[in-house]
Amino acid sequence: MINHGNIVGNFIVDDMGNPIATAGGGQSDIIGDYGEFKIGIEVTLSTGMKQYEMEGEPVSRHIGELQKQGPAFGIFIADKLSDTVISHFYISSIANTKVYNGRVDIIPMSTATFVEFFEKAVKKDLQPSDLYQIHEHSLRMSKQFLFEEKTEKDWHKSVISEIFNLLS
């Protein structure tokens, strides 16, 4: 996974190369350019309602702006995901917007889930097409679950399950 794209960290690092702050305004913390598509990775330490207030709109905007350049989706990482953030990202994956050239897909993951995903993805040598398949599944399920009157929790569970199905 990491070896198949051009991965750029926009975060601030110390003299040893360790991250000390997230990216400045207007950009994702990490951008993975896989040629045919990009992934914007956003990381936060915020929790609860503050997580939604601080991250909901900015993360959607960052990924939306990235999507204006071509196919893209986002991964949002937090130690503990706020239910309101999951709901916000579910809704953004349903709504077709002109301003961002379509639906803005952001997949929320807890830090523990992301670490497990990343370790297994590296071990399996996950390909860019596999990553894009996760994005396509997310968009397909958000639309399907809307019509089936399912919730953001159902969508999120389905996407995380798909991720680990690809890795098994």
Give the positions of each predicted feature:
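Catalytic core segments in nucleotide and nucleic-acid processing enzymes
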Residues: 1-167
